[in-house]
Amino acid sequence: MTEVYSKAPATVGQVKLSNNGTSNKAYSVPKSPAPVRTDLFSKIPAGTKIQVGSHSVIIQRYLSEGGFSHVYLALLENEKPFVLKRIYVPDKTALQLVHGEIETMKRLKGHRHIVNYIDSSALYSKSENRYEVYLLMEFCAGGGLIDFMNTRLQHRLTEGEILKILADVCDAVAAMHYLDPPLIHRDLKIENVLLVAPNSYKLCDFGSACEPLAPATTPDTIMFLEQNIAAYTTPQYRAPEMIDINRRQGIDEKSDIWAIGVLAYKLCYYTTPFEQVGNSAILKASFSFPPFPRYSDRMKRFIATCLQEQPSHRPNIYQTLKEIMEMQGTPLKLPDVYGGVNASTYNPPRAPLQRTPSGSLTPLSSRPAHTSLPPIPTVQTTSSNVPPVNRPSLKSKSPSVSNILSNQLSPISSANNDVMARLQPKSPIPATKSYSATIQTPRSPSLRRADSTSHIIKVPHLPDTSVKTAKTGASEIDVLSRYPSVEEIDKITDKIEVSKPLRNSGPLAFKPFEKISANKQTDLLQNKPEALLDLENRFLPKPSPKPSEFSSSVGSKQNLSMDIPSVQNVSTKQKSTNDTDNSKLKINKPLTGGYAPLPSRPNRMNHSVLNEKSNKEFVRGPRVLPPIEVSSSKMAGLDIRKEPFTPAVPSAKSGLKKDQSSEVANKDVVSKNKDNIAILADREARPQLLLDDNNDSSSSSSEHLISFNNHTGNKILSRQTTSSSIDSNNVQSNIEFLKGLNATHARSTSQVSHTQRLQQSISTSLERVKSNTKKESNSPRQVSKLKRPIGASNKILSGKFGEAFKKFEFGGEKMSRRRKSETKKNLVSILPDTEVDEYPKASNEWIVESEELPQVHETINQYRKSCETQRSRKSHEGSNDLERQPSSPDTVHPGIKRSHFIRERVKQLLSDANKHHQSPSDSETDRTPDSSSIHLPHIERLNLFHTKSESLE
């Protein structure tokens, strides 16, 4: 049932019920268990007008559904909100239970911590043979306590808030226990506590309330009691005497005290103390306190005292409320109707005991037995902020009638004010009075257990427990020794709490914890994960220092409060290990001194995947340095087939010179100066800086530049060819030379001599290769071949078509030597420092290892036959297309056949070469050949080699 808040107090109207007055049958235990729920009636539509007793209400909206009821928000004629509860009653037995709940609410009406009763009525349906009871009560707008707790999952309830909730609930329970005869709620739980206003709570749901139940003695009564407890109580809040009926201890007010202890535990830790174990732990009262959240030791002792296994060891409601008010620091104005005796209906107190200064218990022989009580044990707390528990004073005077009326309204005394005045004692009761004299003089009007016409108080029979012999006192000491002492509670607390605060050092000691946390953060910074190092490599403008140096620099500039992940994602870790070679390609970090990022050589198996990734990820490519010309003396010692690829990383000693040289190189890339002589002279003198320490650095850097272009895509290739001129002598592989040359507008006259050198080579091999029509110039496979990295080219040279490559490209060792001698005579060098035999020496370094394979010869023969058959048929095509001068083989029209194009192109090159030889000049600075007439043969010849290689594969 969901009830809730009204700012204006509820108006109490005239109550008109069929039976007037108080009925004892309403509070007796029903003879049959609770009815089994069936399908309830349909919901009442909004706007329906219903007469409930003397109040006419209009249904506003549907709120919730209970066990056997529907709850609606209704408005009176004065538009005040109330709650209308429509209860489903299948038979007369269930009607008796509902009538008992209504009677309980009527008796408790007007209490500040109990939901107020307004009116009720009952209807009988002959057609359906059932009853419907309408109960009108107070509306609580704050909702349930459980909803409020759900809003505090991150920040749990404070101890002050818990004490306020317990104080309001215990005040409502005390009103029930103070009745004559007393009523027990039997269903105390957080679901039955409602929030009226901020920090104000009320108790509801009195359907399980009844008078105390006597111990069961026969099998029939045991079975009946078990069924009744199972129907009207909540399992996790049941006391041990409710679970084990054979103990024959009776179910009285001490069962509600147990439920208060469970309620307090759940308010603290959001769970019940016996939820994981079950009934076996309840029977033994075995539980523990979690280490978090932290509450005071006095709060834990209060919960432990309420959850005692024996009912007689639990405090009564007055002692419970007194302890709560003392923890709050608020005086308790509720009278003690028990006269200082920890008694209940069916569980009388034990013999009184006195605790000596040493901590032992000794019997009291000088005082009457009933005046001593086993209260909540007074324990020395570990915190100086918590005051010790005070026992109820035995010498205090009884409260006056005016104080009772001003502080607490008793349901019984409100009906009989004249009797209450006569029950006030005229003098305090001396401590030495006898037991009979004490019970003849009542201490409070709430202690009255009879009707208003009798002045003799009927109290539960208490046996004469005055200690007469030492033997009796010893037996009682043994019984009460089960009370938890200070040492026992401290041992339990030490076992449960993981991190207990130091004694005599304040509430908490955090200095060791802060020291440990600081050390942990320092260790985390020193042992940085791979992801953090990767971020440093990406965004730091200089090479990242060691982890220890980085941690020290971070610690000097920033606080150590940042959180560093200690566990890396598996997918991220695998990706970083698989793409280690290409990790730097995806980083556009700042360049120091003009150096471009240095990619590593990818594997041949994954070069197509890497090219696909690079085309997608590179929106803006990094700057690419032009290749560097290397002299033949440096190039002669290179063996590309054997040497692994190592990027040219600048050393620390020559860092300044390298930065300056790279800066000049980048200016050469962007510059469009027509004075090519000064640029070439500058570039010729520049490589010596990179060749001081390592002879292989020039080779690796030239390989690196070509490989970097392969991965950055077509956009970077076009950007490079429009801004720089690359010499063919700088490239070790013709395949890689093709990749770096797409459209170059300035070339040196060394290419003229190179063209002359190629005349004999092309004329001898033209008949074998000019008719290759299997692959078009713009085929997708050829484009992918253009992007083959350097590592793949080394493997191609040692592949199955190595013999064809050697014969076509170099014409054998003898032919290479003959070309070398002829070109030395005819070559006119542009620069005086340039050696003319670089290319032959570089070409002699190619070693073909698979030229003797029979499958290579067979493939070459098939290729030659196909070329011969198609040569005559394709010779006449494409004559009109020679006027086009494409800058790269990729731009050749598909209609122009390659064989015919090569043949006609060679003729044009021969004629151009003769023209240059007829007009030689000694001035090297005025010689700038036309790029359109000199550059294309190399591209076409090398693309021809690609076409040949693809056909062989």
Curated annotation (Swiss-Prot):
Keyword vocabulary terms for this entry: ATP-binding, Cytoplasm, Kinase, Nucleotide-binding, Phosphoprotein, Serine/threonine-protein kinase, Transferase
EC number of this enzyme: 2.7.11.1
GO biological process: actin cortical patch assembly; actin filament organization; regulation of clathrin-dependent endocytosis; signaling
Residues covered by region (Disordered): 343-402, 427-451, 538-606, 641-669, 748-791, 864-953
Keyword Transferase attributed: yes
Biased composition (Polar residues): 355-369, 378-402, 433-444, 558-575, 748-766
One Gene Ontology MF term: ATP binding
Active site, UniProt feature: D187 (proton acceptor)
Subcellular location: Cytoplasm
Chief location: cytoplasm
Reaction catalyzed: L-seryl-[protein] + ATP = O-phospho-L-seryl-[protein] + ADP + H(+); L-threonyl-[protein] + ATP = O-phospho-L-threonyl-[protein] + ADP + H(+)
Name this protein carries in UniProt: Serine/threonine-protein kinase ppk30
Source species of the chain: Schizosaccharomyces pombe (strain 972 / ATCC 24843) (Fission yeast)
Gene: ppk30
